[in-house]
C-alpha cells in the first residue's frame, strides 16, 4: 500500500491547521491565538466578565493594548493628565477604564504618555508584534490589516475578547478559501487603495462573505508592506473574514530588527519557516476572482457603501437604470443622503474637509505620497479643514524628521497627534451635518464621520489632490509630483526610529482614578468584587411574537447602532438607540414611518431583513442594541460573518434563509402575522406555514442550554497546555518572552520612564 500524500494546501489552510488545539465533530475548532491587540472601546465589558468570574488573563505577554478610537488628536504638549485632557465624559470613561483594567490584569500598554501609542493596526506591525504565520485578533474588524504579513488576523467581538484573554484560544469554524489574483502591473499613479476599492466594486460588500481572501498576482507582489496592509485592511469591506498575502522578501525585510521581532537564531529559524507559507501548487479554492491591474483607475466612492465606487472620470449612477428594486432603492437613498444627482460627474462637487489618516492610510508611505502632491501648493479656499493624522507617535516623529509636517503645515493642513480621528465620529474630529469629505479611511456609511456627514473614500494622493483643488479630482493631473508609489519628494529616509530612545511625555497611568463614570453618570468600580462564576447567556428554546419587516440590504453595524452610542462600559441600555439615524429625526423625535416606531412592531422579537445584514464593524454593540430592544431572532438571506458570530455570544439566533422564503416572511411580517421560532426543532412557523432551518450543532447546544463558552473551553485546559508546550518547542520565536525587545507594562508609580520609544 503506497503512503498517503498530503493534499495541497492554501496559505490559509497552513496557518489554520498549525493552530488547531481541538476539532469537534461538527467542525468547530478551538484555535490558538498568538497575538491579541486591545483598545478602549471593545474591552471594558470583557475585563468586567473576567473580574465577575474570578478569572485571570492566561498570557498577559501576548496582549498589547493602546488607546486610539476615543482620544482627541489635539497637541499633547500641555497635557497634564487623561482626566482633564479628554473632555468628552463617555470617551474619558472608556480610556480610564482601560487604564485601570491594564493595571489590574498586568498587560502591556502604550498610553497617551508613550510615543509608541497609535492606532492598533499601525503599532502592531510597527513594533514587530505582528509576525508571519501567526494568529492575531482584536476587537476591531480591521484586524484583517495584519494579514498582509501572512498572518491569520481577524476581528472579534467583546465576548471573544474575554474568551481570548481567559484561554488564549477562540472557538471558530473554518472559512472558505477565496483567491483574488491581480494580473499585471498597476498603472502609473494607482495606489493599493484604488485597487482594493476597485475590487470591492467588482465583487460587492458581500463578495467575500464566509471566506478568507488570499490576494496574489504580479501587482500584489509588487506592493510595499504598507500598501499590502491597506489591501488587507479593507478585505473586511469586501465581506471577508480576513485577507492574507503570502510573506516574501519584502515582508522579511520589513519585520527584521523590529523591537518584538525574533533575533539571532530565532530569526533564522523563523524565516526558514515563513518561506514555507505559500499556497501549494494545485491548492483548491472555493472561489476565484481574476482582476486585471490595467483596468484600475483612480477610484472614489460616491455612495454610502464601500461597493459604491466609480473611477474618478466616471458619472454617478442612475437608479432608474437598475432593474433590482432593492438595489435601486438603495442607490436612491444613497444619492439623497450624499446630496448627489444621477448622471453627473463626481468631480463637479466641492468638498468641505479632507482627512488623511486611519488604519488604512496613516503610515509613513501614505504621508510621503500625500506630501508629494501638496508640496509648494496651498489648500483651496473652500476647504474648511484638511487634517493629517499620523497612525502612531512614531510615524509622526518619522514624518517630522523628514520634514513632511512642514510641507503640510505650509500648505494649510492641520498636523495632528496619533489616533483614529475622523475615521469614525467617536472623538472630537467629526464632520458637521452635510459636510462633504475626501477621506482615506475605510467606511463611508451614513453618519460614520459625523451625523449627516458625507464621506468619499480615496487614496492619500487623491485626498491631497482634492484638498488642493477644492473638489475630487484625478491625481494624474499632478503627474511630475507623484508616480506609482514613488513621490518626487526628498525625504530623510535614513531616519531609523529604532535608534530613537527619547522618553515619554511624563504621564503615569496612576493619574487615572480607581473609579470611572459611565455616560449615564453611574460610578463603576472597575476593580470591584469577584463572584464565583460567569453568568453565561440566556437559554434559547422557543421565541414567539411579532416580526418586524426591514426590507433593506447591507444594513451595516453603524446603522444598527451609530458610533456616538458605543462609548459605554456596559452591555445594556442600547436598545433605545438602535437604528437611531433612521428611527429619529434631527430633534430626537420618532419618525412615524419607521417600522420599530409603529405598533405592534415596537414589541417585535423577530426581525426580517435582506442580504448582508450586519456588515461593518466587529463591535458587539450592534447585537447588544438589538437584544436590548427585544429582538432575539434575525432572519435574512445572508449575514456578515462577525455580526453573525456575535449574535450567538449574546443568546440571539441569526437564521440564514433562502431569499424566496425571506420575501414570503417579509410579506407575512408586513401583515402582522405572528412568528414562532423553535430552536430545538429548528422550525420557523408563521401563519399556516412552517419552514425548517439549519444551525451548527455546537452553537445550538450552547444556546439551548445557555452555556458559557469560556467555561467549556477551560475544561480543555490540558489540551491547551499540551499545544503550548509543542508550540514552544517547534516555534520558539512566537513566544514574546524570548524577545530581546523591552515591553513596558503599565507603570504603577508616578515616575515616568526615560527610554520607552522604539
Swiss-Prot record:
Record's keyword annotation contains 4Fe-4S: yes
Which residues are recorded as modified (Phosphoserine)? 486, 488
**Its domain of life?**
Eukaryota
One of the Pfam families matching this protein, by short name: Aconitase
Q: Give the record's family classification.
A: Belongs to the aconitase/IPM isomerase family.
Which pathway is this protein assigned to? Amino-acid biosynthesis; L-leucine biosynthesis; L-leucine from 3-methyl-2-oxobutanoate: step 2/4
Record's function text: Catalyzes the isomerization between 2-isopropylmalate and 3-isopropylmalate, via the formation of 2-isopropylmaleate.
Q: What is this protein called?
A: 3-isopropylmalate dehydratase
Which Enzyme Commission number(s) are listed? 4.2.1.33
Give cofactor(s), names only.
[4Fe-4S] cluster
Which InterPro entries does UniProt cross-reference here?
Answer: 3-IsopropMal_deHydase_lsu, 3-IsopropMal_deHydase_ssu, 3-IsopropMal_deHydtase_ssu/lsu, Acnase/IPM_dHydase_lsu_aba_1/3, Acoase/IPM_deHydtase_lsu_aba, Aconitase/3IPM_dehydase_swvl, Aconitase_4Fe-4S_BS, Aconitase_4Fe-4S_dom
How the cofactor is bound: the record states: Binds 1 [4Fe-4S] cluster per subunit.
Q: Name one GO molecular function term.
A: metal ion binding
The biological processes this protein is annotated with in GO are: L-leucine biosynthetic process
Catalyses: (2R,3S)-3-isopropylmalate = (2S)-2-isopropylmalate
Q: Which residues bind [4Fe-4S] cluster?
A: 359, 420, 423
